[in-house]
Amino acid sequence: MKVMEGNLVGTGLKIAIVISRFNEFITSKLLSGAMDGLKRHGVNENDVTVAWVPGAFEIPLIAKKLAESRQYDAVIALGAVIRGATSHYDYVCNEVAKGVSHAALSTGTPVIFGVLTTDTIEQAIERAGTKAGNKGWEAAVSAIEMANLLRTFA
């Protein structure tokens, strides 16, 4: 049996991060976690590009543009969508998830979904570096693994 998997060595990888400014008190913590994860796995800080967008809904377009540029081995999408009193939450979450998936599938570049979709601010805080770890860190490690896995197809 042949097993294919990516390693977690980030040396030489070029990574783009698309991050939402909305809920920045959460997303900035996701970015810190992602940068820490990338650096600890050997990605040079100079090989990381960060693109800020107004909100989560704008993430897919910029993620796709970055992936299409072929300058990056992976793109990480970071954001925080917190449920409110209207159905807006559902629309945003669904469209962002579909858009990020489409960006990856249409370009062949890994686009990692690191967008929190939580019911409460407390849940978002927990996932941005407290009780439930840091989903930015997890997204960074996934980006490294997927970039290296895709290299096995070259």
Swiss-Prot record:
5-amino-6-(D-ribitylamino)uracil binds at residues 22, 56-58, 80-82, 113. SUPFAM superfamilies: Lumazine synthase (SSF52121). Pathway: Cofactor biosynthesis; riboflavin biosynthesis; riboflavin from 2-hydroxy-3-oxobutyl phosphate and 5-amino-6-(D-ribitylamino)uracil: step 1/2. CDD domains: Lumazine_synthase-I. It is an enzyme of class 2 (transferase). The keyword Transferase applies. Pfam families: DMRL_synthase (PF00885). Keywords: Riboflavin biosynthesis, Transferase. (2S)-2-hydroxy-3-oxobutyl phosphate binds at residues 85-86, 127. GO terms for cellular component: cytosol; riboflavin synthase complex. Disulfide bonds: none annotated. It comes from the Bacteria. Its EC number is 2.5.1.78. GO terms for molecular function: 6,7-dimethyl-8-ribityllumazine synthase activity. It catalyses: (2S)-2-hydroxy-3-oxobutyl phosphate + 5-amino-6-(D-ribitylamino)uracil = 6,7-dimethyl-8-(1-D-ribityl)lumazine + phosphate + 2 H2O + H(+). InterPro entries: LS, LS/RS, LS/RS_sf. Catalyzes the formation of 6,7-dimethyl-8-ribityllumazine by condensation of 5-amino-6-(D-ribitylamino)uracil with 3,4-dihydroxy-2-butanone 4-phosphate. This is the penultimate step in the biosynthesis of riboflavin. This is 6,7-dimethyl-8-ribityllumazine synthase.
